[in-house]
Swiss-Prot record:
EC id: 4.2.1.19
Protein name, entry field: Imidazoleglycerol-phosphate dehydratase
Annotated catalysed reactions: D-erythro-1-(imidazol-4-yl)glycerol 3-phosphate = 3-(imidazol-4-yl)-2-oxopropyl phosphate + H2O
Compartments reported by the entry: Cytoplasm
Xref: InterPro entries: IGPD_sf, ImidazoleglycerolP_deHydtase, ImidazoleglycerP_deHydtase_CS, Ribosomal_Su5_D2-typ_SF
Source organism (scientific name): Streptomyces griseus subsp. griseus (strain JCM 4626 / CBS 651.72 / NBRC 13350 / KCC S-0626 / ISP 5235)
Molecular function GO labels: imidazoleglycerol-phosphate dehydratase activity
Key words, A-Z: Amino-acid biosynthesis, Cytoplasm, Histidine biosynthesis, Lyase
Amino acid sequence: MSPRVGRVERTTKETSVLVEINLDGTGKVDVATGVGFYDHMLDQLGRHGLFDLTVKTEGDLHIDTHHTIEDTALALGAAFKQALGDKVGIYRFGNCTVPLDESLAQVTVDLSGRPYLVHTEPENMAPMIGTYDTTMTRHIFESFVAQAQIALHIHVPYGRNAHHIVECQFKALARALRYASEHDPRAAGILPSTKGAL
């Protein structure tokens, strides 16, 4: 079986983004967005999902980080969808709960072909982690879901440290996506849908 790879290049007046993802990789990551904490989160996604992930983004960081973060997430979602292909033989559903010290993230995904996000995290988080605006976390997932066309539920019932709260979400997402996108040996050649389409 050939590796499932997606590659997307997205260029606007605000950003230039290249994303390549191999769903059947070993967690090799090469990421550079110009936003240090975001790079750290994308590294978690690749390593814990065992996806080979390349991300190269040049954006209008002289304004702020919004366009860079958003457009990278859009391209990542599109590349993930491309890599999934016809979805024949995959598990389709995946979930994972990940602690990071005092914080906990619960993530469930359905590779359904229908974009939907439910996202909750503790209120009154620190507004910034380095140059990363913590209000962008939800927007990253919104952008990713819109292009990947998946249903994604993320719940962080508790946590104090903003870094930990965000990081455990990316780690749990990585594992949930890995489990959902892996091939089920009992369902070879079968599309996991009663309606015959995903």
